[in-house]
Amino acid sequence: MQTLLALNWKMNKTPTEARSWAEELTTKYAPAEGVDLAVLAPALDLSALAANLPAGIAFGGQDVSAHESGAYTGEISAAMLKDAGASCVVVGHSERREYHDESDAXVAAKARQAQANGLLPIVCVGENLDVRERGEHVPQTLAQLRGSLEGVGADVVVAYEPVWAIGTGKTATADDAEELAAAIRGALREQYGARAEGIRVLYGGSVKPENIAEICGKPNVNGALVGGASLKVPDVLGMLDALR
């Protein structure tokens, strides 16, 4: 199974900055065997990425509408992302769940829309600090996973985000990542049977060049969803080098 390095820019980079980033990457990029690279960018950046990314690097969106089309002002449909050249899209990111009150049902609807339009959904799940401290992190995350995959096909990626370790002073370890990735793998087997073996489980919590090899070296971790370290080309190259 190919490792997936998914670069989540969040709300960063104008189209001009995205073009400069892609041009810089082009001058220095060498594919890493066994590693797929995808850039998850603001919607306005997609055309710049389509025109300037090196061949073989995928790109996609950070959110998608749960609706096919219609009177949903401000929304971006899966068909629009696909037409812009995207091949994947994040749904259910912890920031969307927290700041936009997205439910598991809405996340599942978005994932279904993505799949219906030929996009690979990257479904995010994870627990907060209160849940972690109560020792309920595994059942809570798996309940979120099942709700977020309701009616969703096996052509999906799952990203575990340790929300409790983001901006709290707490540190998630590679073993923490493996614990949840293994539990997620078990839940995927229950839902999808043998097809679960082809589903990549990513880890998304302060991943950087210094720790990505240890994290992705765990048996059930098949890649990383990277935030801050995705914004600078040298950091991206450092992560690719660490995975070689």
UniProtKB/Swiss-Prot annotation:
Listed Gene3D superfamilies: Aldolase class I
Active site, renumbered: H93, E161
Localization annotation: Cytoplasm
Pathway note: Carbohydrate biosynthesis; gluconeogenesis; Carbohydrate degradation; glycolysis; D-glyceraldehyde 3-phosphate from glycerone phosphate: step 1/1
The UniProt record lists the keyword Ribonucleoprotein: no
Positions bound to substrate: N8, W9, K10, G167, S206, G227, G228
Example GO molecular function: triose-phosphate isomerase activity
Enzymatic reactions: D-glyceraldehyde 3-phosphate = dihydroxyacetone phosphate
Principal EC category: isomerase
Gene Ontology CC entries for this record: cytosol
Source domain of life: Bacteria
UniProt KW keywords: Cytoplasm, Gluconeogenesis, Glycolysis, Isomerase
Cysteines paired by S-S bonds: none
Any GO BP annotation: glycolytic process
CDD domains: TIM (cd00311)
Subcellular location, principal: cytoplasm
Catalytic activity, EC: 5.3.1.1
Classification via PANTHER family: TRIOSEPHOSPHATE ISOMERASE (PTHR21139:SF42)
Role this protein plays: Involved in the gluconeogenesis. Catalyzes stereospecifically the conversion of dihydroxyacetone phosphate (DHAP) to D-glyceraldehyde-3-phosphate (G3P).
Subunit structure of this chain's protein: Homodimer.
Family: Belongs to the triosephosphate isomerase family.
Protein name: Triosephosphate isomerase
Taxonomic placement: Bacteria, Thermotogati, Deinococcota, Deinococci, Deinococcales
Gene: tpiA
